[in-house]
């Protein structure tokens, strides 16, 4: 079982349900081949072997099923969703020292939405910074780091940003290319939170943004 990628998790239940359906079908086939014996176990590092099969023929958790994970030694009491756990996911989060593991008594591999989002945050953080930066980072810092979606900004705003910082670009860039260029520069800026908030509040109170818009209206 390959588990789910961050892209699958961000797309919601459809992709995760498809993965779960494959798991259920494989478990049902294994059960039929062994004379209706119990489903085969899936080994997860540090968590032992558990049954990887959910309800026969199901494409998701059964009614009332709870998340299959344990956090800090205690079983999660949240309802299971369509996202599923795997050895690959266990390995990726273990490098971040996140204290979650598969419960040995669980008879399925479905996890709750809370842990799905937690795993996504940790894995996205790992992709952004790379494994060289793992030392010294705490799980709380990794999880609480916000992800800024610059694609939500208007094209004119992205161009304003590019002009303000004099970013070298070729003419005729589309929005996706602007987002990539602005995003790389944005992540490299050291920020003093107190000074930034103070400047923002001052700008709002003095309508500084309106003045900027008028000044930039003649610049292309």
Curated annotation (Swiss-Prot):
Residue numbers carrying Phosphoserine? 131, 138
Q: Which InterPro entries match?
A: His_deAcase_SAP30/SAP30L, SAP30_C_sf, SAP30_Sin3-bd, SAP30_zn-finger
GO MF annotation: an example: zinc ion binding
GO cellular component terms, alphabetically, are:
nucleoplasm; nucleus; Sin3-type complex
Protein's UniProt keywords contain DNA damage: no
Q: Where is this region: Disordered?
A: 123-143
Q: Which Gene3D superfamilies match?
A: 6.10.160.20
The family line of this record is: Belongs to the SAP30 family.
Question: What protein does this entry describe?
Answer: Histone deacetylase complex subunit SAP30
Which gene is transcribed and translated to give this protein? Answer: Sap30
């Amino acid at each position: 079982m390959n588990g789910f990628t961050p892209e699958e998790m961000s797309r919601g239940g459809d992709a995760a349900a498809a993965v779960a359906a494959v798991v259920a079908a494989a478990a049902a086939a294994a059960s039929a081949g062994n004379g209706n014996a119990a489903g085969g176990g899936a080994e997860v590092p540090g968590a032992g072997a558990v049954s990887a099969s959910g309800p026969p023929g199901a494409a998701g958790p059964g009614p009332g099923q709870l998340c299959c994970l344990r956090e800090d030694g205690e079983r999660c009491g949240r309802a299971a969703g369509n996202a599923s756990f795997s050895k690959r996911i266990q390995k990726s989060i273990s490098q971040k020292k996140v204290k979650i593991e598969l419960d040995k008594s669980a008879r399925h591999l479905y996890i709750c939405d809370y842990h799905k989002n937690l795993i996504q945050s940790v894995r996205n953080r790992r992709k952004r910074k790379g494994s060289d930066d793992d030392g010294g980072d705490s799980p709380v810092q990794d999880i609480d780091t916000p992800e800024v979606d610059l694609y939500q900004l208007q094209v004119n705003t992205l161009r304003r940003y590019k002009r303000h910082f004099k970013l070298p670009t070729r003419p005729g860039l589309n929005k996706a290319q602007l987002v990539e260029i602005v995003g790389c520069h944005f992540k490299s800026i050291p920020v003093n939170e107190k000074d930034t908030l103070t400047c923002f509040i001052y700008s709002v109170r003095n309508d500084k943004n309106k003045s900027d818009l008028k000044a930039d209206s003649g610049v292309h």
